[in-house]
């Protein structure tokens, strides 16, 4: 996880530097003054990358060194169970559709569609979380 953390720290630094340069250059050369939307978007993108980098740093401290993190690793060092994955689940598709409904409601500013989208999102996430606790797949 150290490599991933370094990668996202580099990305965060790049976006912060780009936001600073963009803000200064638009303030100096743009006819309407500084363009705040782009500066804010670049700064927030850097902030999101920094959040991911910080998460990877915390995870790297908690777990043992992975085969990906040292040079002398063999392919067989990474063998083993990776976790449980649900290959037949339809819930992620429903979550995406629900998010689309909410996004269209926000874009068109239709409060009833926003509420419907949020309700669909909550019910879809509940379905995903409880997928293996209800119904025929119950373990």
Swiss-Prot record:
Parts forming coiled coils? none
Entry keyword set: Cell membrane, Membrane, Translocase, Transmembrane, Transmembrane helix
Topological type in the membrane? Multi-pass membrane protein
Listed GO biological process terms:
electron transport chain
**Localized where?**
Cell membrane
Catalyzed reactions: 4 Fe(II)-[cytochrome c] + O2 + 8 H(+)(in) = 4 Fe(III)-[cytochrome c] + 2 H2O + 4 H(+)(out)
Entry GO MF terms: cytochrome-c oxidase activity
**Cellular component terms per the entry's GO annotation:** plasma membrane
Enzyme Commission number(s)? 7.1.1.9
Q: Which Pfam families match?
A: Cyt_c_ox_IV
Residue ranges crossing the lipid bilayer per the database entry: 10-30, 36-56, 78-98, 101-121
Subunit-structure text: Associates with subunits I, II and III to form cytochrome c oxidase.
Q: Hey, which family's this protein in?
A: Belongs to the cytochrome c oxidase bacterial subunit CtaF family.
Provide the function of this protein: Part of cytochrome c oxidase, its function is unknown.
This one is known as Probable cytochrome c oxidase polypeptide 4
Q: Which gene encodes it?
A: ctaF
């Amino acid at each position: 996880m150290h490599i991933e953390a370094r990668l996202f720290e580099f990305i965060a630094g790049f976006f912060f530097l780009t936001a600073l340069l963009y803000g200064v250059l638009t303030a100096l050369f743009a006819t309407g003054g500084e363009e705040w939307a782009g500066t804010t978007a670049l700064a927030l993108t850097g902030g999101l990358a920094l959040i991911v980098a910080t998460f990877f740093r915390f995870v790297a401290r908690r777990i043992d060194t992975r085969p990906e993190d040292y040079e002398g690793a063999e392919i067989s060092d990474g063998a083993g169970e990776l976790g449980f994955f649900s290959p037949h689940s339809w819930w992620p598709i429903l979550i995406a559709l629900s998010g689309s409904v909410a996004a269209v409601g926000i874009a068109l500013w239709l409060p009833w569609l926003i509420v419907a989208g949020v309700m669909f999102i909550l019910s879809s996430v509940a379905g995903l979380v409880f997928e293996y606790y209800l119904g025929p797949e119950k373990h």
